[in-house]
């Protein structure tokens, strides 16, 4: 399927799209390059800015996958399903040929964090553990935590399914757990999200991200939480409405600069749209085969940027 999209990408004329929502992202890149401060960070020099917000429509199945470079959407989607299952075992991603967590789960990296007790590929109590078993004592990535900790995601689902509670202002899911930060391979960057239902029917998600790698990570986070909103809307009998992205520390790594300067000169295409075809009994049963492309993902060519562990 990806080959078909690549073919479409090559054949489509490069015409200006009325995709003003992606232009928000391109403007963020430009602003950081032009006005950001140069900082020496944990893993390299960055152009840095603090505090930004972007808003994307999810109406009619739209999903904001950045088009001014080719995004590895399958990798992004599979990572989300892995989070939803509550997994922290990188081996499961490796088996799907997804390597985005390899550096952070290597023996050397875990040792650098003082996590000598974790075996290689065990990421500790990161996103999935906090979403499904918040603050449950973490043993290892093979332990069954069913019934332990707080299942934040299931709580939100239960509230959304009930017309009497779906307008609650407490539909919050946090991956930031100060009690377990030092046990994680990497503290959560996208740390807290809140869901909101408008007029009893339209579901939106707001994400606060404390640290945003604007070149690589932020496009993944936009697509991932937008897909999560679509899945929850389907699962709970609602319609996806908007994704709102709040960013704290927004940064561009110095060695991403050349690629991003190419990207900001490109004109975006329209965002694709999807349908969640099946409705499962349990949220963890959704998988990539449940996604149907209504309007395909068309993009410019990929741009190489190194991930900073």
Q: Where are these predicted regions, by residue range?
A:
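Terminal, non-catalytic protein-protein interaction segments that mediate quaternary/complex assembly
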Residues: 5-309
């Amino acid at each position: 399927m990806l080959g078909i999209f690549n073919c479409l990408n090559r054949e489509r004329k490069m015409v200006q799209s009325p995709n003003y929502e992606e232009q928000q992202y391109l403007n963020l890149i430009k602003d950081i390059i032009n006005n950001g401060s140069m900082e020496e960070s944990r893993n390299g020099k960055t152009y840095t800015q603090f505090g930004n917000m972007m808003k994307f429509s999810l109406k009619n199945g739209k999903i904001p996958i950045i088009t001014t470079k080719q995004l590895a959407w399958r990798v992004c989607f599979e990572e989300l399903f892995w989070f939803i299952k509550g997994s922290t075992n990188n081996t499961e991603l490796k088996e799907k040929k997804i390597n985005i967590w390899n550096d952070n789960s290597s023996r050397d990296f875990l040792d650098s964090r003082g996590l000598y007790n974790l075996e290689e590929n065990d990421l500790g109590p990161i996103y999935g553990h906090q979403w499904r078993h918040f603050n449950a004592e973490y043993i290892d990535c093979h332990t069954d935590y069913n019934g332990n900790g707080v299942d934040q995601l299931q709580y939100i689902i239960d509230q959304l399914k009930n017309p009497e509670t779906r307008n609650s202002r407490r539909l919050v899911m946090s991956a930031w757990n100060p009690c377990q930060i030092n046990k994680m391979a990497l503290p959560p960057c996208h740390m807290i999200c809140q869901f909101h239902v408008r007029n009893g029917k339209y579901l939106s998600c707001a994400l606060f991200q404390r640290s945003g790698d604007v070149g690589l990570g932020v496009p993944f986070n936009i697509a991932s939480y937008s897909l999560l909103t679509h899945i929850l809307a389907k699962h709970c009998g609602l319609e996806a409405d908007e994704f709102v992205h709040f960013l704290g520390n927004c940064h561009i790594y110095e060695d991403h600069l050349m690629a991003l300067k190419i990207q900001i000169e490109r004109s975006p295409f329209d965002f694709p749209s999807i349908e969640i075809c099946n409705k499962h009994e349990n949220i963890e049963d959704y998988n990539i085969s449940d996604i149907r492309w209504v309007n395909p993902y068309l993009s410019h060519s990929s741009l190489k940027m190194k991930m900073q562990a």
